[in-house]
Design a protein with these regions (language model features):
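Bacterial N-terminal signal peptides that target proteins for export
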Residues: 2-14
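Short linear sequence elements within intrinsically disordered, low-complexity coil regions
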Residues: 14-15, 326
Length: 388
């Protein structure tokens, strides 16, 4: 068995102020403005590695025996309190695993694919960068790092890092339709993972030695950027590199706002934290509405509400957190009107409940058309309902 060390984990050349990351360097307290700026940039560059590792610990409980196994696998849609990942999807079934390839390959299988609903394998490296998105997976995929194994089941997929995440999504058209849920669960049940048992958990500690002021400034910049830049521009997709194709700050801000975000070609996410006037969305201010035409997508679309303070789903009595293209009630002209308020009442159509404090609305577009990918089509921001 290979030793799980930082040297094994970080073979990729990642330039930092401390040089190539093969071990956790210990930054000294900044002594000048230039030193401070360099350390903030260093922190920002390392954040996605550490955040990915923290999710690996969260999903496995720090138990290496849970690597190469599903750490999240619910046959029902996630509810408030079950959403481990910040801004988790509530429009698909999830299966998530963290894999370690130091002891050999891992095989993914999709034994019961469906042509009638969207499903995918989203593969991410140790940096929260997408290295492969498999749409409508069918059959087997052998994931390996380094030398290609002599025996490959199905398609061989080279993984750029020893530690990697596998996120699967299966579309649910209507959670209240028993037949539809059964169809989604059939695809879910057919998705398997097989790999060696790991006996030692990797240890990644890249941020703990930074000065508190450095960390605070880095997070301030990430939060500030996340509020003004479209989420899709903060995602590193297949064939892209952080720092080259996506600025480090964008990559880290996107990781913090929603770790596990897929590449735009898979699904584009549009997060709205403000109303049409630029003011922060707050449930205590009253009701908001969005009137929109159907987004141009090949698969499906949805809108979901989150508590901006926690980044999690907001609890409600009906466990209703999203509306999608199947469940949305349309206006006569084909558009849809969505309402966001503290308490949805009988007779309210396309209504989602929000917290009294800040909230955000995330629109997800699965297999988006070019107009979404190039920014020519965007969903309108919520408008505050004026009281008579």
């Amino acid at each position: 068995m290979k030793t799980l060390t930082m040297k094994n984990l970080y073979r990729a050349l990642v330039l930092t102020t401390c040089g190539i990351i093969i071990t956790a360097c210990s930054p000294e307290n900044p002594t000048s403005k230039d030193d401070f700026e360099k350390q903030v940039e260093d922190y920002i560059q390392k954040f996605p590695y550490q955040n990915t590792y923290e999710y690996a610990i969260l999903f496995t409980g720090g138990d290496p025996g849970k690597l190469n196994k599903w750490g999240q696998a619910s046959r029902d849609l996630l509810k408030a309190g079950e959403d481990t990942i910040v801004r988790s999807n509530n429009d698909t079934l999830y299966k998530t695993a963290f894999i370690y390839l130091g002891d050999g390959p891992v095989v993914l299988r999709s034994d019961a694919p469906s042509q009638e609903r969207f499903s995918s394998f989203q593969l991410q490296d140790e940096r929260n960068a997408n290295y492969r998105n498999i749409i409508g997976p069918a059959g087997s995929y052998t994931l390996y790092h380094g030398e290609k194994p002599g025996t490959v089941t199905g398609e061989a997929v080279e993984v750029p890092s020893l530690l990697s995440a596998v996120v699967t999504r299966i579309e649910v058209k209507d959670k209240d339709d028993a037949a539809d849920m059964a169809g989604a669960q059939a695809v879910f049940d057919g998705i398997k993972i097989e790999g060696p048992t790991i006996s030692e958990m990797p240890v990644v500690d890249l941020l703990s030695d930074f000065d508190e002021q450095v960390a605070q400034e880095a997070h301030r910049r990430m939060d500030e950027l996340a509020g003004v830049v479209p989420f899709s521009r903060m995602i590193v997709g297949p064939g892209q590199e952080p720092g080259k194709d996506v600025p480090y700050l964008y990559h880290s801000a996107g990781t913090k706002e929603g770790w596990g975000g897929p590449a735009t070609a898979h699904s584009a996410y549009e997060a709205m934290f403000t109303d049409e006037s630029g003011a922060t969305l707050k449930g205590s201010k009253g009701e908001y509405v969005v009137v929109t035409e159907a987004p141009p997508v090949k698969a499906f679309w949805s809108i979901t509400v989150y508590d901006s303070t926690t980044g999690r789903l907001h609890p409600n009595d009906d466990d209703r957190y999203h509306i999608n293209n199947t469940t949305a009630v349309k206006n006569e002209d084909g558009s849809s009107t969505f309402r966001f308020k503290l308490k949805c009442e009988d007779g309210d159509v396309n209504c989602l409940e929000v917290p009294a404090g800040p909230f955000d609305v995330v629109a997800r577009y699965y297999l988006p058309e070019p107009e979404i990918m190039n920014g020519k089509w965007e969903m309108p921001h919520p408008a505050k309902v004026k009281n008579d």
